[in-house]
């Protein structure tokens, strides 16, 4: 996981910050959700918020260090790979955040795409420009 975090942090620094962005939102699915949380802790000045999709909780033990940073966790209630409780654990460790239950959806969250996009369309600007 550490190498993945280094890769994402480098991408944020090179692509986003060098391109003029002051703040970014990180997103990750499954294992990538844990990577996004860890990088969000490490780059706290640059990362405005984190959105995860069916994240695992392993690797998110440091989520408490997010310090109230906006955290949005989508998770299907029928996920057979990582149970909904994984996102609930991450939110509990972080001490804040919102778990959005994607009812009737599994790990890939395919049935919830429109709902998630609508939520992100509101959440991203509110998070970046708060």
Protein language model features and the residues they cover:
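Catalytic histidine neighborhood in serine/cysteine hydrolases
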Residues: 92-108
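A conserved short beta-strand
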Residues: 45-57
């Amino acid at each position: 996981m550490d190498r993945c975090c280094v890769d994402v942090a480098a991408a944020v620094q090179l692509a986003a910050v060098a391109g003029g962005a002051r703040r970014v939102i990180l997103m990750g699915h499954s294992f990538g959700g844990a990577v996004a949380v860890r990088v969000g802790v490490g780059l706290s000045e640059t990362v405005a918020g984190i959105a995860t999709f069916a994240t695992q909780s392993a690797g998110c033990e440091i989520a408490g260090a997010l310090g109230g940073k906006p955290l949005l966790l989508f998770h299907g209630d029928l996920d057979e790979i990582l149970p909904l409780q994984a996102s609930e654990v991450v939110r509990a460790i972080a001490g804040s955040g919102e778990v959005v239950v994607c009812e009737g959806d599994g790990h890939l969250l395919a049935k919830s795409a429109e709902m998630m996009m609508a939520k992100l369309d509101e959440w991203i600007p509110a998070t970046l420009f708060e």
